[in-house]
């Protein structure tokens, strides 16, 4: 009894001490954790949707919003239906590999018979995919492509030449996965009689090795192929496998732009696959139709740009008459275009000084497309429907904040996920016209906890740069802000091409830490300068061939602007960034040494020659073509300028931005007799997490700020 009372006393004391404060302990204990709805998917009848719950995969009614049943009981990480919804693919155990790839154990359950079959005899596979007729599942293991007959259980091996760090079939290599945004590089035809896949020969790509220290007597090594800027990439080819013959034939792409094959797309036609291909410099992209009976290739059209095309996420949908929709930045903003079946432009569907940021689908009945846009300002994302024939548009989401949608198959309903900078995520069931049916989930409890601990929200402003642009920015001020006082300023940014940090959306990540710093007496701010997204291509692509130049100029300009405000102590301005943001912080502490007193760079690129080919060359061309662009924007070249307090942080097992970057920068600082702090995280990747890593990391950064800014 005495022991229980002691525990209660301690708990009450802790509560009283921290009740009005956002602490790191509370942040990392999950005290402020919000709620969500996992695995939302519409069923083909348009009347029901599914979600993942602790007890299984639950079926709900759109009309009543009530749960009807569990279609599968048990605990699953993810699921995928066959096209006819007779079977379901269940992921039961996964092991992450890189950004998107993972090994997993999968089961297929027949929902009519209740029979369950293990994929690949219960062994791990990658990227399984139902055939459209639901009789088979294709998958990859050890870089080879297979398919399994779901009636007999028979496994057929399609390729035999797969080999680690040499040949990959149907799966992205490291750089494709990282920069084109997906791991699967194969697709079934709609009639299920053929598979088109990409074969990657990475045997000539330079190999990177990373020591893994672990707890063994001798460190192990992680070796994989990583093409750096200007170096050899995988040689890729498109392959056609026909199930009736059991034979594979190469698809001849020699007449087209074929250096990269980022996308393999299934269409509604039974004997057709579409490939999106690109040149190495990524300023021209072909859209190609492949006849899977003959192997013949037809070019629909070529998209070009005088700088680059974002080939990582093309919007392409074929309609019933074989015409198609395509998103392009050709008029200075990302908009939707409609082409006929021969690749001739019919019309531009959306227009204006705003951008289409996501595409949800097309309703053939109403002739409407459903899209997410920045129509209500570049810091907001809203959902609209647009008639492709007459151009009539209707807003169907909240008019501000960050809104996304998950539609029923017939577009009669959708589940809206929305937030603002001051309101956490809410999930609302709506009719297709935007009328609310029911709020499914809110995070009022999370918000009340934060408000009780004096949470402050972001104030949105604009700041001019030297080019005459108005840069989006936010600022967080202490609750008891006194305009007559001078506050130290802590700036955060990312600044990468097409990115956005100044958004009217809820942030469950760094925003809580920033609140912690605000409560310590700091003002925190963020500025999206030139190169960032959602303000048109002129603003985004001005950085071409000079990545880092205009971005750091704008951050320095913004810091000076803040320093000119009466409430900012211009002698106490600091910066923090991760990855590209760490690169910018490194430039701020060197090229901006007279402005910034302290900086924290986490996992920074310090020389673009060390980063991967697809990303870097998209914005910079190769080092051979553009040596000045690479060298004049490397913080290593300006190590002699460092004046302030600098904390450099990197995970030793970073497969993305290699530890080498921080080592080279450190050596340059050392040889210039510069004092700085360095923190290496053993065996941690680009995210630097696991166990108590994040709490320790953020305490380290907090202490550095308190002691040096």
Regions found by a protein language model. Name each.
Residues 62-65, 110-114, 150-153, 242-246, ...:
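Short loop/turn segments that connect beta-strands within beta-propeller blades
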Residues 199-346:
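Beta-propeller domains
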Residues 100-146, 154-184:
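Asp-box/WD-like beta-propeller blade repeats and closely related beta-sheet repeat scaffolds
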Residues 50-55, 81, 88-100, 137-144, ...:
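Beta-strand C-termini and the immediately following turn/loop, strongest in propeller blades
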């Amino acid at each position: 009894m005495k022991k229980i009372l002691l525990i209660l006393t301690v708990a009450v004391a802790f509560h009283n001490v921290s009740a009005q404060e956002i602490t790191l302990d509370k942040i990392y204990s999950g005290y402020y954790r919000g709620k969500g709805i996992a695995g939302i998917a519409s069923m083909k009848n348009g009347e029901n949707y599914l979600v993942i719950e602790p007890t299984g995969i639950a079926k709900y009614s759109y009309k009543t919003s009530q749960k009807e049943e569990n279609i599968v009981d048990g605990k699953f990480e993810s699921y995928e239906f066959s096209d006819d919804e007779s079977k379901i693919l269940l992921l039961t155990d996964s092991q992450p590999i890189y950004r998107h790839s993972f090994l997993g154990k999968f089961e297929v359950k027949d929902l009519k018979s209740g029979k369950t079959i293990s994929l690949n005899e219960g062994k791990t596979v990658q990227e399984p995919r139902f055939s459209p007729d639901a009789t088979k599942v294709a998958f990859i293991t050890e870089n080879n492509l297979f398919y399994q007959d779901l009636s007999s259980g028979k496994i057929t091996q399609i390729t035999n030449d797969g080999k680690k760090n040499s040949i990959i079939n149907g799966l992205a290599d490291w750089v494709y996965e990282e920069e084109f945004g997906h791991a699967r590089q194969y697709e079934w035809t709609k009639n299920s009689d053929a598979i088109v896949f990409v074969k990657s020969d990475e045997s000539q790509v330079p190999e990177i090795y990373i020591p893994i220290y672990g707890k063994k007597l001798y460190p192990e090594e992680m070796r994989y192929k990583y093409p750096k800027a200007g170096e050899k990439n995988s040689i890729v080819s498109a392959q056609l496998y026909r199930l009736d013959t059991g034979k594979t034939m190469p698809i001849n792409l020699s007449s087209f732009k074929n250096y990269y094959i980022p996308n393999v797309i299934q269409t509604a036609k039974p004997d057709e696959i579409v490939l999106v291909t690109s040149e190495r410099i990524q300023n021209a992209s072909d859209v190609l139709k492949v006849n899977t009976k003959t192997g013949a290739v037809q070019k629909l059209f070529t998209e070009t740009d005088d700088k680059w095309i974002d080939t990582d996420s093309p919007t392409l949908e074929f309609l019933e008459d074989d015409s198609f929709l395509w998103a392009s930045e050709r008029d200075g903003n990302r908009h939707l275009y409609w082409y006929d079946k021969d690749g001739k432009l019919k019309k531009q569907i959306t227009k204006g000084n705003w951008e289409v940021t996501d595409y949800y689908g097309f309703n053939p009945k109403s002739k409407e497309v459903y899209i997410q846009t920045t129509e209500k300002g570049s810091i907001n994302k809203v959902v609209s429907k647009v008639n492709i024939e007459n151009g009539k548009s209707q807003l169907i989401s909240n008019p501000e904040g960050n809104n996304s949608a998950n539609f029923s198959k017939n577009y009669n309903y959708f589940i809206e996920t929305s937030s603002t900078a001051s309101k956490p995520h809410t999930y609302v069931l709506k009719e297709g016209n935007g009328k609310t049916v029911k709020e499914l989930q809110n995070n009022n409890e999370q918000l009340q906890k934060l408000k009780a601990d004096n949470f402050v929200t972001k104030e949105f402003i604009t700041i001019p740069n030297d080019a005459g642009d108005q840069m989006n920015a936010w600022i967080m001020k202490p609750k008891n802000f006194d305009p007559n006082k001078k506050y130290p300023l802590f700036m955060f940014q990312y600044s990468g091409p097409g990115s956005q940090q100044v958004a009217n959306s809820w942030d469950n990540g760094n925003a809580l830490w920033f609140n912690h710093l605000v409560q310590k007496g700091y003002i925190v701010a963020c500025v999206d300068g030139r190169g960032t997204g959602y303000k048109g291509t002129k603003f985004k692509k001005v950085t071409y061939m000079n990545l880092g130049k205009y971005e750091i100029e704008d951050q320095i300009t913004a810091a000076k602007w803040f320093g000119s405000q009466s409430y900012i102590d211009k002698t106490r301005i600091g910066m923090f960034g991760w990855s590209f943001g760490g690169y910018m912080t490194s430039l701020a502490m060197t090229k901006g040494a007279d402005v910034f007193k302290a900086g924290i760079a986490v996992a920074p690129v310090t020389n673009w020659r060390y980063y991967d080919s697809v990303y870097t060359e998209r914005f910079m061309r190769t080092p051979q073509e553009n040596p000045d662009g690479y060298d004049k924007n490397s913080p290593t070249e300006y190590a002699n300028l460092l004046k302030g307090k600098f904390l450099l942080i990197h995970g030793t097992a970073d497969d993305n931005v290699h530890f080498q970057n921080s080592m080279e920068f450190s050596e340059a600082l050392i040889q210039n007799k510069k004092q700085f702090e360095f923190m290496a995280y053993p065996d941690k990747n680009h995210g630097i997490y696991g166990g108590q890593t994040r709490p320790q990391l953020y305490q380290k950064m907090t202490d550095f700020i308190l002691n040096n800014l």
